Amino acid sequence: MSSPAPTLFDSSPIDAHTFLAEYWQQKPLLIRQALPGAEAQIDREQLFTLAESEDVESRVVTQSDDSWRVIEGPFHPGVISAHEPGQSLLVQAVDLWSPKVAQLKEAFNFLPSWRIDDIMVSYASDEGGVGPHFDYYDVFLIQGAGKRRWELGGTCDEHTALIEGAPLKLLSDFKPINEYILEPGDMLYLPPGIAHNGTAMGHSITLSVGFRSPTRAELFDDLATDLLLESANHHYRDPLLTPQDAGHELRDAVIDQVQALLKEVVNDRDRLADWFARYMTTPKYPDVETVVPEHREMHHQGKRYINGFEDSDD
């Protein structure tokens, strides 16, 4: 019988239940040696090779004093230097190109699998980083090779001031509150909105496990697109009209009709669940053939959804 997959809490004083109740989407958590051996999952030469492919999403961020520059991949061989200080290479969805990196997702089996977006891997030369910023999604920062200093600030939102004209969404007034130095195997969890700034201490590789967190606008946009594929048999109908309704006035009764028409969709839980399951299991790169086949799965009331479709196989 195979042994259970390791989790982040095998060498931690807390367990998954405590983490979900007290930390998940609430406050940061540092776990030393959460994933020992993480530095062996991928090296910088493998990252450089991935960044040369047109099928792989990558970018290089360089910092010089207070100036930032971002260059999108793919990159020609030799363009990325391991010796230029203040440089960072970021490669998205490395879990789709490296079986070893993909195995790291097993450590997060205490969370819904369909919430995981991808594992981004970044290589940085000495003093490299992407600047102080915050994310709208949960992220686990796992230290691979080398060391990285992480400074954490307060909670941010859409009203937090950013540096104008910067190629990245960088915080204009970042005030560190806590500082951690991560070594190979260490893990730092950050909930959405926490300001953070990572700086390489020598050559450094960080693996970032990010989670899908669609905005309300994105949800409505996809739901509306999904509705367009249905037969157009639900039309707006007027409330009871009187001659006094002629002219330009918008009556509350009309808004009630519109609201009722839209509520038919959001109040239909089965319909909503079917759409959401297909939406959240849609592959990140549906048209790209990857080394590790992209597999996103969700179950709901006896139905199984795989990669954006309900699976009819028993």
For each feature predicted by the language model, list its residue ranges.
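Fe(II)/2-oxoglutarate
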Residues: 2-8, 171-181, 197-314
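Active-site region of the double-stranded beta-helix
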Residues: 2-22, 35-186, 194, 199-235
